[in-house]
């Protein structure tokens, strides 16, 4: 909570913070909560953007719940998991944790999606349930469908598959899975009846996003998304996660669980090539071939270690279902790949678990986590100090039409750090109630 208190507000935070939670008219509800169909995400964004303390409290609770749920249901090394989250690509960390609006959509949706998944696992084996359980799983499924589009669509696919498999195996329906499916359908309808999605279907660009309308543009979008979006965010930029995957395969080889040294060596080489390609910006077509070979090698090693183990392949199903909708929408942001990032971590710990290999939470892991936390705390305290100084300086110079302010000390840890842009000025003034004609410029230091 201490760390999240010092997360600076971004332009979007000022926009949402200027909204009131006391909706007095249907029009206000439509314009604010129903702005883009993300009812729950928009509500949380408005709620946390009024105050640093409120934001810190909500961020802390949600992140703690995610870690608790995963630690409760999976055999993980808690401290390795936390390290992998803290050291995810900086842009992704900034977009899903520090940026209030990004947190409200992508961290909240991760919590809800993981909750839905564990509820599916629980109630797949339990057809009977009490009335309050039915209400609870319906609400969770409904809320999960009111945050992020690809997760809504992905959850629909997952629940359809689980309901179908259950029916084929048992020649009857599972009422709990049906209730969750209905809740997800209702949530999807509430989300996608928004005019912006209908406009997207008919070719209108909304917030720089579009759906291709012809076979040529569809092919171009799929190509760009695969080459320069999905594979880059899933493979090339996840340097630490790639290192963890290498460690898992190597550790299992040393334990005698993985016996294919050729497959392991080729995976080492392909991992190095994908990382170098991401760092040095290799030709995207060459990278596409490398990434495809990487994935083939990766799934080959997974198969060698797990064969057709249900626990492994259902996580792979989850990853595919939440990523598949992203193939057809352009552009893609790093924040969309936070949930797949978490699912891959879970997958690798499951590979260890089914091979009866446990990584202990050594003291040095705890010390390293503490050092990381202190460093991140320092970075965000410095940015918070810059924010406070900036706000006080602007408040004392409102008589000027052009105000020069300092930028953040660590701008990579602030989303949309464009103080001299129109976007910042408009919503900053709206948030504070200042004259919207004031212009802001970065001071040359």
Which residues make up each language-model segment?
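Intrinsically disordered, polar/acidic, low-complexity terminal segments
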Residues: 1-35, 39-65, 74-77, 173-177, ...
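Transmembrane catalytic cores of multi-pass membrane glycosyltransferases
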Residues: 4-54, 100, 149-298, 327
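Membrane-interface micro-motifs in multi-pass membrane enzymes
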Residues: 38, 83-121, 148, 281-301, ...
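Transmembrane alpha-helical segments of multipass membrane enzymes and assembly factors
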Residues: 66-80, 88, 100, 354
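Membrane-interfacial loop-to-transmembrane alpha-helix junctions, especially the N-terminal start
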Residues: 74-82, 129-134, 173-180, 257-269, ...
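Membrane-interface transmembrane helices that cradle and orient dolichyl/undecaprenyl
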Residues: 113-132, 169
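Membrane-interface alpha helices of multi-pass inner-membrane proteins
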Residues: 132-160
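Signature aromatic-anchored transmembrane alpha helix within multi-pass, membrane-resident enzymes
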Residues: 134-135, 261-271, 306-321, 352-377
């Amino acid at each position: 909570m201490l760390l999240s208190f010092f997360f600076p507000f971004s332009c979007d935070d000022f926009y949402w913070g200027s909204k009131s939670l006391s909706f007095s008219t249907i029009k206000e509800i439509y314009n604010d909560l129903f702005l883009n169909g993300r009812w729950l995400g928009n509500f949380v964004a408005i709620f946390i953007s009024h105050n640093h303390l409120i934001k810190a409290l909500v961020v802390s609770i949600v992140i703690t719940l995610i870690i608790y749920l995963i630690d409760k249901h999976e055999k993980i090394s808690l401290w390795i998991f936390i390290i992998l989250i803290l050291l995810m690509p900086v842009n992704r960390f900034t977009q899903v944790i520090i940026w209030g609006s990004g947190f409200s959509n992508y961290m909240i949706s991760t919590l809800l999606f993981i909750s839905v998944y564990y509820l599916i696992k629980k109630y797949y084996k339990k057809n009977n349930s009490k009335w309050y359980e039915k209400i609870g799983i319906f609400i969770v499924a409904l809320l999960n469908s009111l945050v992020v589009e690809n997760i809504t669509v992905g959850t629909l696919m997952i629940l359809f598959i689980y309901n179908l498999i259950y029916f084929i195996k048992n020649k009857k329906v599972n009422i709990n899975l049906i209730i969750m499916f209905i809740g997800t359908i209702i949530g999807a309808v509430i989300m996608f009846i928004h005019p912006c999605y209908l406009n997207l279907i008919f070719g209108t660009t909304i917030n720089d996003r579009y759906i291709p309308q012809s076979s040529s543009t569809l092919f171009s979008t799929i190509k760009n998304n695969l080459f320069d979006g999905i594979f880059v965010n899933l493979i090339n930029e996840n340097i630490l996660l790639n290192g963890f995957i290498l460690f898992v395969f190597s550790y299992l080889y040393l334990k005698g669980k993985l016996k294919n040294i050729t497959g392991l060596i080729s995976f080492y080489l392909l991992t190095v090539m994908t990382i170098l390609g991401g760092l040095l910006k290799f030709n995207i077509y060459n990278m596409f071939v490398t990434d495809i070979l990487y994935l083939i090698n990766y799934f080959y090693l997974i198969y060698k270690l797990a064969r057709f183990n249900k626990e492994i392949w259902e996580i792979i199903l989850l990853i595919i279902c939440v990523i598949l909708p992203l193939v057809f929408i352009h552009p893609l942001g790093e924040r969309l790949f936070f949930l797949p990032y978490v699912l891959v971590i879970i997958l690798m710990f499951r590979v260890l678990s089914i091979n009866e290999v446990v990584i202990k939470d050594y003291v040095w892991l705890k010390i390293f986590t503490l050092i990381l936390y202190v460093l991140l705390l320092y970075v965000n305290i410095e940015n918070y100090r810059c924010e406070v100084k900036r706000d006080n300086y602007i408040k004392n110079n409102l008589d000027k039409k052009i105000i020069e302010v300092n930028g953040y000390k660590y701008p990579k840890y602030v989303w949309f750090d464009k103080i001299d842009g129109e976007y910042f000025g408009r919503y900053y003034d709206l948030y504070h109630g200042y004259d919207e004609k004031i212009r802001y410029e970065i001071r040359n230091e």
